[in-house]
């Protein structure tokens, strides 16, 4: 058999004759125009404070790819689309910030300063204008004060008086090459060492012996003055009293970071008693260095990339700082080594040991009344995830929920965590049933209960403003569509709001009467729509992104077929069959990358170049199939983890079975089947060509993964 390994397969096909429908020429050059053909997707939609306007990022298909996105605005009903000027953009509130419990004001950071928006008048007030970076503002429960971070510490500001209170004193670790501090400490002035330039510190100008003698005589003279002169005694007493008061007010101990410690995140508790600091310790991992030969300087420059798998990674602990005393308590997650039992999927029992297990802890999530806190923790090996109740006073935790997976914890919305309206339960996402669903766990005691269930996935979730209901995007109707739903805040049936087949990514307006919907379909790129937030409401299209000639071609709404696998499983695939199909023609299989990604569905694919290339292949007589092999997203936990510790196993089997399906069911010549893919798809292509040479005649491995020792650290499987 004549077999050829071609990198890439596209090179053998780039001479395809132009196929036209209307005025569009189906050529390699045309489909590789990228956004110049399919347009730039609108992104990051957000509503105005009064829900009357929608803002989003977008560019015209004629804009250069390296040009920044522009900010556009439209009215609530989708009319009045226009690009905002730079001056108008500067007047917009930031996309992220915090709203007070009274819903009256919105505080945010912009250009390293703080601003507050009055939701009743629309007026914006600048709160800070400094050379320091103010960030992460949040309202306190009284809605009159905010806390924020500046210079690695937490501050509280009154919006009425402007009074500023520092809530923590976190001192960064000194650089490793910093000079030693003079004996005089912070008061050492400009002096260095014991005998030179002591300034106002204790260093003095003379040597150690001279300083000692001078100090003794000065002390005698000072005491004599106090004994002989009453005015001096009174001044000294007043000074001592003032110093005592100052020390009483400044009794908070500093939290001195040591060595290579850094603070990644800060948070103030609602009662203002504690500051939480995520303290990171870097591991011994070395970055992958990539040479940049084309630089602005004309010299070769190093680009530090990610570290490799197996390297020691950074660890993070949560410190609890008492805002009055400065005393530090560390969160104790209670998980010790050993903690292993991989015999089945059940949660392993914890065995006592002296060494803490390495957990990555999140920051506390507080109940609405500010009285209770929970945190999430994930083991470094990603096999376990916990939800803990936290006692801020002691740092002790109590387990509320625990998930264990012999492969790795994952799935959509895996980091979801919040409080139910009753403030007695927390909601979270879990694949414990085999599919990603929403659960509620009681804070005090008891087992978690399922809020959603079935052989489908909840892809993302958020609460309504009054927490009376959930808004969800889910695949309830089947794995190939993502619809937008609402559900009672206590669980129950789902009501479908945005229901056209395809993918819906929804942003709800502040008044919750309207939604902005980023919607796409198999042969329709993502566009922005607006609609009322009610059952089966009609959508109004706001944007048109592709070049006009894109719509001149009849892009295929590729049917989804089920490929029978050797173990009895049905593997989803998209089929591209030429209109002029002749039995015995060639076949091709596209293998998507990323591994954990879904490419067989009714949305516009992120692999749109490959989607259009499938049309070129069809025009040349190829029957093409795209496969969501084992390890792909969208089909539950077991599908996701089926390749654990054996990449190139079941995933490759699915590709081989797809080739057999093309021959047996679609009339393709089994001796004329090739495959191609990039990244993980390139890896599968290499595995196929080297281990299945009797199945595949040609292969194109683009940017392939060829050595798993070089994969990204903490990347599962």
Model regions: which residues?
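Positively charged n-region of N-terminal signal peptides that target proteins for export
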Residues: 1-5
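Serine-hydrolase catalytic core recognition
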Residues: 333, 370, 376, 467, ...
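Beta-propeller folds
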Residues: 7-8, 12-514, 520-531, 535-537, ...
């Amino acid at each position: 058999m004549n077999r050829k390994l071609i990198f890439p397969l596209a090179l053998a096909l780039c001479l395809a004759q132009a196929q036209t429908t209307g005025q569009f020429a189906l050529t390699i050059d045309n489909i590789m125009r990228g956004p110049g053909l399919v347009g730039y997707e609108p992104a990051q939609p957000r509503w105005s404070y009064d829900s009357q306007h929608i803002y989003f990022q977008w560019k015209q298909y004629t804009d250069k790819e390296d040009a920044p996105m522009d900010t556009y605005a439209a009215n609530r009903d989708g009319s009045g689309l226009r690009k905002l000027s730079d001056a108008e953009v500067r007047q917009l509130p930031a996309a992220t910030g915090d709203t007070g419990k009274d819903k009256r004001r919105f505080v945010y950071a912009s250009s390293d300063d703080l601003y507050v928006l009055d939701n009743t008048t629309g007026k914006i007030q600048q709160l800070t204008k400094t050379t320091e970076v103010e960030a992460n503002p949040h309202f306190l429960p009284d809605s009159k004060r905010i806390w924020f971070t500046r210079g690695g510490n937490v501050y509280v500001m009154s919006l009425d008086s402007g009074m500023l209170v520092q809530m923590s004193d976190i001192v960064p670790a000194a650089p490793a090459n910093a000079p030693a501090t003079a004996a005089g400490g912070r008061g050492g002035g400009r002096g260095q060492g014991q005998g030179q330039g002591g300034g106002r510190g204790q260093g003095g100008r003379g040597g150690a012996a001279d300083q000692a003698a001078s100090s003794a005589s000065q002390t005698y003279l000072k005491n004599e003055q106090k004994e002989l002169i009453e005015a001096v005694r009174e001044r000294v007493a007043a000074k001592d009293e003032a110093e005592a008061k100052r020390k009483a007010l400044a009794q908070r101990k500093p939290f001195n970071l040591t060595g290579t410690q850094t603070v990644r995140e800060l948070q103030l508790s609602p009662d203002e008693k504690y500051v939480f600091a995520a303290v990171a310790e870097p591991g011994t991992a070395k970055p992958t260095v990539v040479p940049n030969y084309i630089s602005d300087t004309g010299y070769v420059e190093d680009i530090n990339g990610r570290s490799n798998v197996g390297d020691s990674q950074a660890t993070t602990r949560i410190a609890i700082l008492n805002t009055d005393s400065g005393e530090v308590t560390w969160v104790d997650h209670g998980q010790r080594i050993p903690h292993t039992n991989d015999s089945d999927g059940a949660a392993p029992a914890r065995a006592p040991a002296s060494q803490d297990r390495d957990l990555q802890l999140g920051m506390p999530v507080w109940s609405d009344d500010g009285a209770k806190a929970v945190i999430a923790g994930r083991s470094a090996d990603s096999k376990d995830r916990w939800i803990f109740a936290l006692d801020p006073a002691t740092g002790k935790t109590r387990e509320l929920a625990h998930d264990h997976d012999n492969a790795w914890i994952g799935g959509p919305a895996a980091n979801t965590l919040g409080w139910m309206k009753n403030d007695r339960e927390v909601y979270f996402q879990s694949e414990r049933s085999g599919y990603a669903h929403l659960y509620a766990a009681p804070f005090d005691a008891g087992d978690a209960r399922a809020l959603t269930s079935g052989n489908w996935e909840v892809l993302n979730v958020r609460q309504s403003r009054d927490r009376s209901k959930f808004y969800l995007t889910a695949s309830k109707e089947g794995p190939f569509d993502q619809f937008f739903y609402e559900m009672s805040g206590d669980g129950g049936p789902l009501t479908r709001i945005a229901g056209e087949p395809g993918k819906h990514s929804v942003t709800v307006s502040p008044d919750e009467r309207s939604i902005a919907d980023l919607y796409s379909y198999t042969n329709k790129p993502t566009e922005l729509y607006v609609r009322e937030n009610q059952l089966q409401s009609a959508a109004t299209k706001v944007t048109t992104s592709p070049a006009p000639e894109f719509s001149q071609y009849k892009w295929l709404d590729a049917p989804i077929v089920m490929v029978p696998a050797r173990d009895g499983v049905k593997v989803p695939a998209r089929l591209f069959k030429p209109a002029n199909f002749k039995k015995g023609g060639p076949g091709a299989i596209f293998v998507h990358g990323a591994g954990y990604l879904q490419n067989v569905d009714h949305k516009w694919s992120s692999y749109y170049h490959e989607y259009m290339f499938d049309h070129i292949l069809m025009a040349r007589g190829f029957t093409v199939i795209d496969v969501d092999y084992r390890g792909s997203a969208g089909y539950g936990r077991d599908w996701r983890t089926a390749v654990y510790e054996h990449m190139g196993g079941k995933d490759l089997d699915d590709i081989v079975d797809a080739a057999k399906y093309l021959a047996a069911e679609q009339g393709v010549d089994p001796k004329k089947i090739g495959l191609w893919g990039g990244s993980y798809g390139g890896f599968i292509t290499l595995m196929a060509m080297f281990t299945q040479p009797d199945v595949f005649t040609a292969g194109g491995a683009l940017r392939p993964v060829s050595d798993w020792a070089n994969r990204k650290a903490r990347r599962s499987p």
